[in-house]
């Protein structure tokens, strides 16, 4: 069983990842979900996958979700949501599917916790390539590029 933390769960890669989870419930369990501001979809995902932790990076969206959701999932807001999802003890793999350089810090923190990384954020490798790859080697962490563009960037960064 793989225990997943999905950062960017309401975006294209995040929803596709959750589709795979739904098709293989015997192989995957979602332990954390984080989105930027899509309250409605995140709330639906929380109810369906029942993660231990869920969060919204956008503070006003987070406050609205707090007012709407009263279930057992722990809610986290702001930048702390990214770090909570990246470092949650139960996760064996962290999927980073958020846009831009915002993916660097949670990826670094997940690596430091020994999590396998499913990388769907090319900016993390473009902007933080040497840091990310050296940390992955230091901590013995596997980075799995999620699509062919990321795979090419990943291969390039390891060769330089």
Where are the model-predicted features located?
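Alpha-helical segments flanking ligand/cofactor-binding loops in enzyme cores
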Residues: 43-47, 83, 108-109, 134
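Short acidic-hydrophobic, aromatic-tinged amphipathic segments that line or gate anion-handling sites
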Residues: 55-57, 74-81
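Residue-level signal for inorganic ion chemistry
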Residues: 10, 46, 94, 114, ...
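Beta-loop-alpha module in the N-terminal Rossmann-like domain of NAD(P)-dependent dehydrogenases
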Residues: 77-110
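N-terminal Rossmann-like dinucleotide-binding module
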Residues: 1-54
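Active-site-proximal loop->helix
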Residues: 16-23, 44-45, 125-141, 156-159
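Rossmann-fold NAD(P)-binding glycine/threonine-rich loop
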Residues: 65, 100-113, 122-142
């Amino acid at each position: 069983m793989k225990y997943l933390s999905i950062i960017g769960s309401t975006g294209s890669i995040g929803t596709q990842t959750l589709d795979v989870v739904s098709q293989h419930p015997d192989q995957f369990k979602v332990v954390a979900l984080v989105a930027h501001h899509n309250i409605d979809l995140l709330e639906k995902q929380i109810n369906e996958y029942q993660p231990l932790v869920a969060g919204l990076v956008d503070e006003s969206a987070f406050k609205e979700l707090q007012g709407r959701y009263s279930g057992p999932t722990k809610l986290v807001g702001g930048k702390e949501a990214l770090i909570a999802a990246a470092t949650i003890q139960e996760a064996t793999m962290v999927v980073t599917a958020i846009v831009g350089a915002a993916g660097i810090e949670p990826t670094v923190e997940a690596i430091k916790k020994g999590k396998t990384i499913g990388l769907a954020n090319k900016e993390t490798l473009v902007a933080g390539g040497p840091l990310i790859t050296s940390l992955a080697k230091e901590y013995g962490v596997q980075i799995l590029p999620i699509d062919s563009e990321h795979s090419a960037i990943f291969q390039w960064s390891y060769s330089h």
